[in-house]
C-alpha cells in the first residue's frame, strides 16, 4: 500500500472520545451532567473566585503578610567596628561602600555606627553618608 495523506491515521490512544454531557441517562453523563448535585456550582455561568476554597479560610489569608518596605527612609547601617576595610579607605564615598557591602539599589543613604565612626567623619566625601550622632 502506498503511503499518502488519505491513508494517515492518528496513533493509537492519542485521540480521546468526546465527552457529551446532559444527553440522557444511558450516556452515563445525563441528569446532573457531571456537575454533582444542586447548588451554586451546578448552575450555568458559575466560576469560583481565584483562591476560593469553599468557605474554608483561603491559603493567601492564612499565611502571614511579608515583604513590606517602608517608603520613609532607606538608610543602610554599617558597623565600623566589625568592618576593618572601611577604616583602611582613604576617602569614604557612597560608591566605595556599595562596592564593599553590595547593598540594594533602593538604598538612599548610609549610616556608619560604632565607637570609631566619629573618627572617620573627616574621610567622608559624600553627603549621603552620616556617622552615628550626626543628623
From Swiss-Prot:
SUPFAM superfamilies in alphabetical order: Ribosomal proteins L15p and L18e (SSF52080)
- Spans through the membrane: none
Q: Which InterPro entries match?
A: Ribosomal_uL15, Ribosomal_uL15/eL18_sf, Ribosomal_uL15_bac-type
Sorted alphabetically, the Gene Ontology BP terms of this entry are: translation
GO MF annotation, one: rRNA binding
Would I find rRNA-binding among this entry's keywords?
yes
Query: Keywords for this entry?
Result: Ribonucleoprotein, Ribosomal protein, RNA-binding, rRNA-binding
Disordered, as annotated region: 21-66
A GO cellular component annotated for this chain's UniProt record is: cytosolic large ribosomal subunit
The family note in this entry says: Belongs to the universal ribosomal protein uL15 family.
Briefly, what is this protein's role?
Binds to the 23S rRNA.
Summary of subunit composition and partner proteins: Part of the 50S ribosomal subunit.
State the protein's name.
Large ribosomal subunit protein uL15
Biological source species: Helicobacter pylori (strain HPAG1)
